[in-house]
Amino acid sequence: MDLDLTEDQNTIRQVFADFFSSEAGPGRARGAEPVGFDPVAWERLQQTGAPGMGVPESLGGGGATLTDLTVVVEEAGAHIAPLPVVDHMVTARLLATVGACDDDVLTGAMVVGLAIRPPVGDMVRTVPTGAVASRVVALDGEVLLAVDGGPGTHLGNHGCLPLAHRPLKGATVLADGPDAVAAHSRALDEWRTLTSATLVGITRTALDLGVDYVKERKQFGRAVGSFQAIQHLLADLPGLLDGARLLTAKAAWAGDRAEAGQPGIADAGDNEITDFATLAGMALVVAGEAATLTTDRSLHVHGGYGFSEEYDIQLYFRRARALAVLLDDPARECRRLADLLLGPAQASGPPVSGPDANPESDENPEPHGKGEPYEGPDALVTGATA
């Protein structure tokens, strides 16, 4: 396993570090609040080819690997870019998988996003890009849906992310059955991996902000960074950053292997876990912990200034806290990982979603045709309209 970046990947890193340094950063993030989207910067990002770079070249994309994409989004996180880079990249790849990646998606002219949790009733709730995406892709049971209708109403949140609920009304079917479930599951693991890379970028900059501040801030005639109590707060953070970066790189590596048809191993008794779904979840948990602790400690050493809007660290603190819990409570993600490694625990109650949620449903529902209007899960069984 070689997790070192190639020469081409280092070039990608430098190109996008320069781009986000110019077109993103704390000033642009403040200007994009509260929705968390800068349309001018997004138009300029389109010129780099980033929105479609993860789509296969045979479909008009850039043919980038998942590892390539982690390089890009780490820089987006480091510069706290108010752009839906992760969600658009992941959703474009998913749409390409089911043969529905339009040119507007490839170029970024149409912003798309992924519903990271199943619908509740006739609504997909808390979609990460729901307030800016023209199309959201959601999985309802075994049916993969395209939810159009334009951006939803922004849900205020401390992280200033473009969250919104999106109604399923008017959704069309992209695919259904086990292949649709597998494609969405793969996309969700890619989302975990790229969100982890974003959190690594946030951690990196937050650590730099804290270290730079304690070098400059003087008290009692000395830089406060010379005091042991301050040093102890920051000393272990580089190790957390390295661990999060390592797991994220390993998850991306496993994802690229899986895409090439090389299955991984998920066995708690094995010293070398190579299963993509397992590593993606591990990376998200560890990167989330690293980002929340690092931004917390960095804000702490800023003293009262850390809480003021004029200082940049509060932007990273809020973004880290939001991203770390956006998918789910980290404790539940850890439980999911335990199920993957040790086998599922006995259920303590009825499932909340999926085909088993309706005990009366037919085991082999009539498949929906691609592009058909979606009439809700009941229509798969009874043919009734919603």
Residue ranges, per PLM feature:
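Alpha-helical interface subdomain recognition
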Residues: 1-79, 187-365, 369-386
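FAD-binding core of flavoproteins
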Residues: 80-86, 93-208, 212, 345-386
